[in-house]
Amino acid sequence: VHLTPEEKAAVTALWGKVNVDEVGGEALGRLLVVYPWTQRFFESFGDLSSPDAVMGNPKVKAHGKKVLGAFSDGLAHLDNLKGTFAQLSELHCDKLHVDPENFRLLGNVLVCVLAHHFGKEFTPQVQAAYQKVVAGVANALAHKYH
């Protein structure tokens, strides 16, 4: 992902304020509510029968935290996202058979959650930088599919 020094600074500064536990669970939960067909990958998580059930599900929250932990690793290696996410790409492609479009959807949901949490601090410039990052991460996760 090519970011200007200003974009990189904006992404890093905001990410330092992110509560990974909270934002991860909310982002994954919103993905499952807004795009209900993604729930088929999480059938082992128990009750996903309503938006409240999804958002309150401890397994959704725990996996969201794990997902955002991996995203944090990616932020530390923006120059090598394909390498950073190679194993996760292989897992999601070969073993889990996740539609790579879901990575793009989750990235966009994450941007929405960050905007919700940070309000005016999440300026259009910050959003533009994050859109580049989530697109780069989605492409890296989809790399094994190509």
Swiss-Prot record:
Keyword Ribosomal protein carried by entry: no
A GO BP annotation: hydrogen peroxide catabolic process
Keywords: Acetylation, Heme, Iron, Metal-binding, Oxygen transport, Phosphoprotein, S-nitrosylation, Transport
Residues bearing PTM S-nitrosocysteine: 93
Domain Globin: 2-146
Top-rank taxon, per record: Eukaryota
Tissue: Red blood cells.
Residues that bear N6-acetyllysine: 59, 82, 144
Modification Phosphoserine occurs at: 44
InterPro entries: Globin, Globin-like_sf, Globin/Proto, Hemoglobin_b, Hemoglobin_oxygen_transport
Modified residues (Phosphothreonine): 12
Binding residues for heme b: 63, 92
In-chain residues carrying the UniProt-annotated modification N-acetylvaline: 1
Entry GO CC: blood microparticle; haptoglobin-hemoglobin complex; hemoglobin complex
One GO MF term: oxygen binding
Function, as annotated: Involved in oxygen transport from the lung to the various peripheral tissues.
Family recorded in the similarity comment: Belongs to the globin family.
Assembly and binders: Heterotetramer of two alpha chains and two beta chains.
Protein name: Hemoglobin subunit beta
Species per Swiss-Prot/TrEMBL record: Semnopithecus entellus
Gene: HBB
